[in-house]
Amino acid sequence: MRPMVASIKTALLLAALSFTAAFARADTYSWTNLQSDIPGVATHADPNLVNPWGMAVPSATGPIWVSDNGAGVSTLYNQQNGTARSLIVTIPTAARNKGGGNPTGVVFNGTSFFKVTLNGNSLPGRFIFVSEDGSISGWNPGLDATHAIIAVDNGTNNGTNRAVYKGATLGVAKGHNFLYVTNFRSGQVEICDENFKRVNPTGFADPNSTGATRHSEFATLMVRFL
């Protein structure tokens, strides 16, 4: 019986090794640089991809929308191969900003809310952008195919009230949609209702908002709705 036992042990060992090897192969990844603003670094070169920050997708197969902080635009890339699409969306600036746009966070909006207005016409911003100059803007091709439109300008405020936005996300609470944006300057997460109006909901208290560790000592960067 010893040979049979040995054979069984050998078979089990080989099966275990095969399983381990298969599992290891399934858990490995290869790194491919698809896009860069620097020629020769990636498979494709895009001069607009300067300091890319936020990313958003409208669907599982839709293009990736990227906030190009250093170029003031949003560029689009195919998920399948990383190639760039022809559409380039210019992000507007706060009134106080005399330079170019500096978008950071971006989020896809599939709701009928968060409307932006141009020439008396209002449509939902399909992609909502926040910027370091304190502006929040939305893009809808029915209003302007190549430019986002300002919805909020908190970059003209004085002192600590002047916003520096870094991240954005959407969420639903009590049946209503809300936009959450991080204000790097104030160290807070600001909340806007479906009309881009800032709200101050109750029910949450930050134990570090007073005392030795005040919120002003922190700089909020990104945000996610759980």
Q: Locations of the language-model features?
A:
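Bacterial N-terminal signal peptides
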Residues: 9-21
